């Protein structure tokens, strides 16, 4: 995962500068507690799982996403937070937490894989 750049001009922030994977759309609050991010080349797979993880954060008041059009490879992701944090910090934490969750699932799956390779499933036919 690419590191986010320092926030100097919030309207032009890119988390992955070479391809501008994540940008902040115009219309955000001045204190960055209410921000809509546009994430390129992502869909419901990331959107729903990231929304779920971010909503577990008690400082988040609202989190949702939309796919503007099925033929466009982009997702709009909205985060509104309490005044004690920013949507940018919440997004960073949410992405880190989602990576940790995926790593834990992969680890558990890998642990069980050798034990279950001899088990086959019979289908009545």
From Swiss-Prot:
A GO MF label: DNA binding
CDD domains to which the protein is assigned, alphabetical: RNAP_I_III_AC19
GO terms under cellular component: RNA polymerase I complex; RNA polymerase III complex
InterPro entries named in the record: RBP11-like, RBP11-like_dimer, RNA_pol_Rpb11_13-16kDa_CS, RNAP_AC19, Rpo11-like
BP term (GO), one: transcription by RNA polymerase I
Subcellular location: Nucleus
Keyword hit for Membrane: no
Taxonomic superkingdom: Eukaryota
Keyword RNA-binding assigned: no
Keywords: DNA-directed RNA polymerase, Nucleus, Transcription
One Pfam family it belongs to: RNA_pol_L_2
UniProt subunit comment: Component of the RNA polymerase I (Pol I) and RNA polymerase III (Pol III) complexes consisting of 14 and 17 subunits, respectively.
Protein function: DNA-dependent RNA polymerase catalyzes the transcription of DNA into RNA using the four ribonucleoside triphosphates as substrates. Common core component of RNA polymerases I and III which synthesize ribosomal RNA precursors and small RNAs, such as 5S rRNA and tRNAs, respectively.
Family of this protein: Belongs to the archaeal Rpo11/eukaryotic RPB11/RPC19 RNA polymerase subunit family.
Designated name of the protein: DNA-directed RNA polymerases I and III subunit RPAC2
Organism: Schizosaccharomyces pombe (strain 972 / ATCC 24843) (Fission yeast)
Organism phylogeny: Eukaryota, Fungi, Dikarya, Ascomycota, Taphrinomycotina
UniProt gene name: rpc19
């Amino acid at each position: 995962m690419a590191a986010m750049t320092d926030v100097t001009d919030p309207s032009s922030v890119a988390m992955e500068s070479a391809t501008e994977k994540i940008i902040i759309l115009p219309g955000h609050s001045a204190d960055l507690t209410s921000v809509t991010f546009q994430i390129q080349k992502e869909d419901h797979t990331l959107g729903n799982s990231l929304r779920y993880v971010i909503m577990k954060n008690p400082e988040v008041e609202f989190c949702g996403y939309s796919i503007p059009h099925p033929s466009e490879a982009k997702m709009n992701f909205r985060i509104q937070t309490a005044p004690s944090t920013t949507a940018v910090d919440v997004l960073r934490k949410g992405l880190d937490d989602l990576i940790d969750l995926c790593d834990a699932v992969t680890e558990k799956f890998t642990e069980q894989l050798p034990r279950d390779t001899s088990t086959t499933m019979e289908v009545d036919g």
